[in-house]
């Protein structure tokens, strides 16, 4: 049974499911023209050593993960997988102001060839507990995404970068996730969408597809997350 929603949960749910009229993604592409960009996840046995505090805590913490830079290098995503978990570290280099609970990152996955269902994981800056939502290609448009209990061993935390950060010494927003892949269905590849928000400024993967802090990109416009050695599923 889903627990009673607190104020933060309600705010997060509204942030995710609200889709303005006139659309939020670029209208100069169609699913027939869109070619899904791909991210490669690295297999890394160092991921269990991650200190989940929202920052790059020590020199080698995220070193054995794939490096992905988007939006002119302002959004940096490190990705790795190990023992049926997906690990994400997201840096928003532009966000140097701390708006606790308002700055956030959402990462969404859907197993390829697994139907239209997808799961979104939310980490908010300054909060140690993330949130999980489930939806499908229809509910993304009609506001029907549902807040569900977090899967066991899920971590979603937002914080401020430390002096160990590899990209910018000025303190900025950083987010860390540990997502149990078994909870959404093990697969070799996933449809993948990520969005990090600083007030009205939005950065995404795939890049430049949304300009609003609200809503989820339609599933057909998502990118793809996979591993070269087929070790993710």
What are these regions (language model features)?
Residues 24-53, 106-135, 170-172, 181-233:
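Acidic/polar low-complexity flexible segments
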Residues 73-79, 155-157, 171-175, 179:
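Extended low-polarity, hydrophobic cluster-rich segments
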Residues 90-93, 177-181:
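Short, hydrophobic/aromatic-enriched beta-strand segments in well-ordered soluble domains
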Residues 34, 58-139, 197-203:
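Surface-exposed, glycine/proline- and aromatic-rich loop segments on solvent-exposed faces
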Residues 1-24:
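Secretory targeting signatures
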Residues 8-11, 39, 137:
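Short, intrinsically disordered, low-complexity terminal segments
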Residues 128-171:
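Glycine-aromatic-enriched beta-strand/loop faces of beta-sandwich-type recognition domains
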Residues 50-54, 58-60, 157:
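Disordered, acidic Ser/Thr/Pro-rich linker "stalks" and the adjacent N-terminal cap
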């Amino acid at each position: 049974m889903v627990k009673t929603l607190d104020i933060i949960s309600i705010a997060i749910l509204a942030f995710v499911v609200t889709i303005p009229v006139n659309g939020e993604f670029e209208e100069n592409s169609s699913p027939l023209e869109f070619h899904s960009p791909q991210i490669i996840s690295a297999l890394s046995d160092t991921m269990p050593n991650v200190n989940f505090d929202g920052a790059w805590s020590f020199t080698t913490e995220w070193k054995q993960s794939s490096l992905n830079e988007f939006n002119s290098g302002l959004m940096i995503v490190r990705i790795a997988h190990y023992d049926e978990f997906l690990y994400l570290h997201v840096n928003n280099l532009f966000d140097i102001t701390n708006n606790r609970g308002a700055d956030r990152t959402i990462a969404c996955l859907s197993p390829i060839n697994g139907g239209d269902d997808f799961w979104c994981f939310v980490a908010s800056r300054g909060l140690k507990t993330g949130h999980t939502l489930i939806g499908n290609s229809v509910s993304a448009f009609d506001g029907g995404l549902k807040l569900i209990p977090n899967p066991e061993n899920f971590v979603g935390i937002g914080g401020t970068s430390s002096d160990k950060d590899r990209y910018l010494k000025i303190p900025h927003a950083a987010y860390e996730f540990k997502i149990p892949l078994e909870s959404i269905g093990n697969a070799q590849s996933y449809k993948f969408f990520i969005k990090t928000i600083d007030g009205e400024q939005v950065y995404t993967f795939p890049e430049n597809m949304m300009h609003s802090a609200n809503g989820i990109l339609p599933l057909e416009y998502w990118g793809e997350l996979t591993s070269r050695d087929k070790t993710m599923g």
